């Protein structure tokens, strides 16, 4: 056990951690140069295209130093804020972490968030300054930033370039020398944490585990602690870079894959503890709490016959993504679909993209919203995920909305505009720190609802892409909120309802109906687009009707003939207007997001 090293890699997006992981794999000789695919650790197409890590991956490597043989278990983690739940579980199964910072860009907001998670798990941190081959690299300045913002000693930071391979061997030696070996009692009852799970079409649900005490053997009867279910271990494997290698036992301190042959991945939940069924351990590795969704959106198939296929697709995605939650819902405008809960905006985009790509579905997504706690006059408390479900105004005593603590790190030249953006989003400043003369760290408390719309895009455009952002939920607070309904041709479209602060209802209503007017195709009758609070209409635009020349086929002749045709058309349009349905294009549902 003394020669095992379990370590994670934590970094902000684009600071080069997947490339660095590939270099470490290559340096350990686990993969030949020919087999080394770009980003071995990112297996999904979306991950490779977007250059982000979504699912935490793991790999077991062999390394020889001074004639001694070491086993390095590398646990790659996602860097994006939405996937911090995955990060926290990966860190719980590690003994140390490489903190990677880009030598040109410096410390970013998500780096700090993940460092705090690592500190909570008492991990040994090795600061690594990557991309030292870049012309703009300034390792000394970045080392100072690490000390200022995080407060850890960066004098012995390892300087590497994952692209050129400089400093990789020194880094692996540092891992062996500085990260502690795992501690655990090999004679105690089995105790292992599941830090990742996914679905394999041949083997069923697989759990990636780190064993803290005891060992797991093939054919052992194990118990999952959160739900008490018992299952037999059918197979055990080590995650090697290119293929999994079977093993009869996973010992204390090791990581491995457990095959339980289950059809449902919900049984194998990330963060849960596995123990021996006959001789269980007393307490779990960490208290299991399921990942909580923060952002909700309706997802509907464009073709209503695809509803069952969408259900199957969501079920299959949930096999690999335990944080995804969904329930069926119906919308008058969009038919049958699902209300899906996501960890954040990127998670929502990725899920929608995977549904469309991997399952060939055409989908419409409604605007995202958050959970509201609504207290009624009779003392009842209800949780509303969908703005269209908000009760009538006269029944509501008060509405509470979730607030988050937002951390923004930005070059100081964009500070003024970013503060204006945060104030417009109803944010209140709690802290401001200068990391050095060029970069500032801001902390604000902001309603979550303001973040899910378009905050991230605006932040990036104001700062030309240089500002970074991270958030954590804090609490629910009372807000003066109202439901803004959009009516098209006199009918409220439930999928377009949004919850807004009362003082913003009028400007937002005006912008929305104006956007909708541009998007709705012209009909043979005129269409009124209205924004309303309850029964009161606060804004209106009209989509003009198309003209059709019904008199074209009359040559000369009597005016009464033409008049008769025009009257007939007028009647037809009147009837059409009363029973006509307006087909709304997908852009209409996303126009809610564009509030400018």
Curated annotation (Swiss-Prot):
Record flagged with keyword Membrane: yes
Protein keywords: Cell inner membrane, Cell membrane, GTP-binding, Hydrolase, Membrane, Nucleotide-binding, Protein biosynthesis
Record carries keyword Protease: no
Gene3D superfamilies in UniProt: 3.30.70.240, Elongation factor 4, C-terminal domain, Elongation Factor G (Translational Gtpase), domain 3, P-loop containing nucleotide triphosphate hydrolases, Translation factors
Reactions that this protein is recorded to catalyse: GTP + H2O = GDP + phosphate + H(+)
Membrane-traversing stretches: none
Pfam family membership, one: LepA_C
Entry membrane topology: Peripheral membrane protein
One cellular-component annotation, GO: plasma membrane
Domain tr-type G, first and last residues per copy: 2-183
UniProt-listed GO biological process terms: positive regulation of translation
Cellular localisation: Cell inner membrane
Binding site for GTP: 14-19, 130-133
Main location class: membrane
GO MF annotations, alphabetized: GTP binding; GTPase activity; ribosome binding; translation elongation factor activity
EC number: 3.6.5.n1
Source organism, top-level taxon: Bacteria
Family according to the record: Belongs to the TRAFAC class translation factor GTPase superfamily. Classic translation factor GTPase family. LepA subfamily.
Protein role: Required for accurate and efficient protein synthesis under certain stress conditions. May act as a fidelity factor of the translation reaction, by catalyzing a one-codon backward translocation of tRNAs on improperly translocated ribosomes. Back-translocation proceeds from a post-translocation (POST) complex to a pre-translocation (PRE) complex, thus giving elongation factor G a second chance to translocate the tRNAs correctly. Binds to ribosomes in a GTP-dependent manner.
Name of the protein described by the UniProt record: Elongation factor 4
Biological source species: Sulfurimonas denitrificans (strain ATCC 33889 / DSM 1251) (Thiomicrospira denitrificans (strain ATCC 33889 / DSM 1251))
Phylogenetic lineage: Bacteria, Pseudomonadati, Campylobacterota, Epsilonproteobacteria, Campylobacterales
């Amino acid at each position: 056990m003394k020669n095992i090293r379990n370590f994670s890699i934590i970094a902000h997006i684009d600071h080069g951690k997947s490339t660095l992981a590939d270099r470490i794999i290559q340096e350990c000789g686990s993969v030949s140069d020919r087999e080394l695919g770009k980003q071995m650790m990112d297996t999904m197409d979306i991950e490779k295209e977007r250059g982000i890590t979504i699912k935490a991956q793991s790999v077991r490597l062999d390394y020889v130093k001074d004639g001694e043989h070491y086993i390095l278990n590398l646990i790659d983690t996602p860097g994006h804020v939405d996937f911090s739940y995955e990060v926290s579980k990966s860190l719980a199964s590690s003994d140390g972490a490489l903190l990677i910072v880009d030598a040109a860009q410096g410390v970013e907001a998500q780096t700090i968030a993940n460092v705090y998670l690592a500190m909570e798990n008492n991990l040994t941190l090795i600061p690594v300054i990557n991309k030292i081959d870049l012309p703009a690299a300034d390792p000394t300045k970045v080392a100072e930033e690490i000390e200022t913002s995080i407060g850890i000693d960066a004098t012995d930071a390892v300087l590497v370039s994952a692209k050129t391979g400089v400093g990789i061997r020194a880094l692996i030696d540092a891992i062996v020398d500085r990260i502690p070996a795992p501690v655990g009692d090999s004679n105690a009852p089995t105790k292992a944490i599941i830090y990742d799970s996914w679905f394999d079409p041949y083997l069923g649900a697989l759990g990636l585990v780190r064993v803290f005490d005891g060992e797991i053997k093939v054919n052992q009867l194990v118990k999952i602690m959160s739900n008490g279910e018992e299952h037999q271990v059918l197979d055990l494997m080590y995650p090697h870079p290119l293929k999994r290698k079977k093993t009869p036992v996973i010992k204390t301190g090791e990581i491995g894959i457990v095959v339980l042959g289950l059809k449902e991945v919900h049984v194998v939940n990330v963060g849960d503890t596995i123990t021996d069924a006959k001789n269980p351990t007393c307490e779990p590795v960490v208290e299991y709490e399921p990942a909580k969704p923060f952002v909700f959106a309706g997802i509907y198939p464009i073709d209503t016959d695809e509803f069952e296929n969408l259900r199957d697709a969501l079920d299959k995605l949930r096999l690999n993504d335990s944080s995804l939650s969904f329930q069926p819902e119906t919308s008058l405008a969009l038919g049958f679909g699902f209300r899906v809960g996501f960890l954040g905006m990127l998670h929502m985009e990725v899920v929608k993209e995977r549904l469309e790509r991997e399952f060939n579905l055409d989908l419409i997504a409604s605007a995202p919203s958050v959970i509201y706690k609504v207290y009624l006059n009779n003392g009842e408390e209800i949780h509303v995920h969908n703005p269209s479900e908000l009760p009538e105004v006269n029944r509501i005593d008060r509405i509470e909305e979730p607030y988050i603590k937002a951390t923004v790190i930005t070059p100081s030249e964009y500070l003024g505009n970013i503060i204006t953006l945060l104030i417009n989003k109803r944010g209140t400043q709690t802290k401001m720190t200068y990391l050095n003369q060029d970069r500032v760290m801001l902390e604000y408390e902001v309603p979550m609802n303001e973040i899910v719309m378009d905050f991230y895009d605006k932040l990036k455009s104001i700062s030309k892409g240089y500002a970074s952002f991270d958030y954590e939920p804090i609490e629910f607070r009372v807000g003066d909120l109202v439901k803004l309904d959009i009516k098209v041709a006199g009918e409220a479209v439930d999928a377009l309802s949004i919850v807004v602060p009362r003082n913003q209802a009028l400007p937002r209503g005006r912008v929305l109906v104006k956007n909708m007017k541009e998007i709705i195709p012209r009909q043979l009758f005129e269409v009124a687009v209205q924004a309303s609070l309850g029964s009161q209409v606060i804004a209106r635009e009209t989509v003009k009707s198309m003209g059709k020349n019904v008199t074209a086929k009359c040559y000369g002749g009597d005016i009464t003939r033409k008049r008769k045709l025009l009257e007939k058309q007028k009647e037809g349009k009147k009837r059409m207007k009363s029973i006509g349905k307006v087909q709304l294009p997908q852009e209409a549902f996303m126009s809610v997001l564009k509030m400018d």
